[in-house]
């Protein structure tokens, strides 16, 4: 005979209890984020009077370090002058190096925690993704744009680029499309962190 509760209802057997546990935890399992991370490798390949162009490859890795996906494109930055790269508001490309890319939400939380300690009001950032802890600089973001005047140190993604002989400047094109592709890539695979390595050829 089976086991019964005091109210006369039959107690579920071990298989029924296991199934109920599994069903009850489906939402939890589905909400767990995959252990994937991203490395963005950039190489500066063109130096203009008012802008710098680099090629990038963003690579996604699984939890064991295996490459699972990648995308390519170009970044536009302002003019490169390494003597001013660490100078605040210098309107130049940042110094070469390895950085973390963090979300607007994460950076806002950190900034506003410090501001509250000083009795200051919270701020709201503009862009979705930021290059973190750049020496001497702040607010270095990844966002749309086509021309050198559109960036004060930020990275502007593009599908392709061109060089204007008359002005000596580089431009990137189809920026909105490439930015969306890159941000979708970040959202899909950047759960365990995003790094960007800024280099020159």
What is the predicted role of each segment?
Residues 27-171, 177-194, 200-201:
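Cell wall/extracellular polymer interaction/catalysis modules
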């Amino acid at each position: 005979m089976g086991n019964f509760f005091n109210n006369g209802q039959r107690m579920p057997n071990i298989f029924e209890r296991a199934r109920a546990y599994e069903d009850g935890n489906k939402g939890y399992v589905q909400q767990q984020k995959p252990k994937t991370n991203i490395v963005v490798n950039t190489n500066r390949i063109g130096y203009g009077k008012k802008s710098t162009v680099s090629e990038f490859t963003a690579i996604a890795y699984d939890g064991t370090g295996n490459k699972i996906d990648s995308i390519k494109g170009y970044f536009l930055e302002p003019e490169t002058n390494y003597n001013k790269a660490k100078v605040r508001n210098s309107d130049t490309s940042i110094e070469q190096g390895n950085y973390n890319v963090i979300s607007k939400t994460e950076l806002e939380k950190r900034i506003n925690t410090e501001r509250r300690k000083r009795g200051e009001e919270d701020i709201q950032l503009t862009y979705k993704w930021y290059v973190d802890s750049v020496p001497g600089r702040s607010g270095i973001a990844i966002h749309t744009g086509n021309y050198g005047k559109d960036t004060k140190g930020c990275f502007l993604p593009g599908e392709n680029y061109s060089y204007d002989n008359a002005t000596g400047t580089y431009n990137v094109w189809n920026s909105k499309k490439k930015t969306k592709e890159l941000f979708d890539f970040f959202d899909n695979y950047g759960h365990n962190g995003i790094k960007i390595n800024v280099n020159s050829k």
